[in-house]
């Protein structure tokens, strides 16, 4: 059955108060995409609700214009049958939340891949986006006399442009990150609550974010939200993929019965309680995923330090933006192994020991099966 005259509905991906997201196939062109469709009908292109939708999309189009591989590609918004719609790439995969729930323990190379891809994507929003959004005439940027395709931007001007054009995602959580099935790469989704230059991209400036990922300052005053609020939520994501769970757990049943009380408890956690150390939780996740093996710490101490700095209660004690997080991670990764982890050789030897124990156990099980098969065959021969 045709949907909005152009699409075949495949299934609902998600639904919120403002819009529903469908997986669809274009009837004539055959491509498969996701489309965000407003729940409420609008009268025409002059309807304030549609204009608000367009304002949201203006920045989102520049963020998700296909220039960054780890940000979902967004296409031109339109009005069809009195519904505001915008197409975006359909990401065939699972959410980070689903991935962690399935794996229990995420291998360290996957943790670093997540850090490389999602932290870099957020750094693009917090910092590099000015290169695509700035207007040389409005921003009074001079061209390079030796190369008219380039601009002369000193450090002070760059910082002004970063402050003006930085986009705060404002809704980072593990259901807004996807892991592609075909190559395992991570993709950042849903900028519907994004904020630029202190103003909500979407007309509704409601405080954004899932409770487990909200920075302490968000509970007090949504007007103080900045890139450092995103850094806190990013720290929760990094903590979650390394530890196998978020630092502060929300009791779903308590939230359903009394969301106000549960929300207040979560606020107290974020404001007052230090995050639990990561290693015991990572050990627990490892043992759940690998019950016959011995856990050995497999990540450098500096990684936990980076995460804990992201999770500082005071925004001033965090990184200023995701670019600083990304640069710090890359700096540590580029250090020589001897300075990164004094116990790396011992850890490698212990892993080999674990592998040998596992293979020995598997071989023993195989021999038992062979013996049982042999005994069964002898018994059958005796009967014959």
Give the role of each language-model region.
Residues 42-64:
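AlphaC helix of the eukaryotic protein kinase fold
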Residues 81-95, 99:
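Conserved short submotifs of the Hanks-type protein kinase catalytic core
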Residues 114-115:
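Activation segment signature within eukaryotic-like protein kinase domains
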Residues 204-218:
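Conserved activation segment of eukaryotic-like protein kinases, specifically the C-terminal portion
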Residues 230:
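Conserved catalytic-loop aspartate of Hanks-type protein kinases
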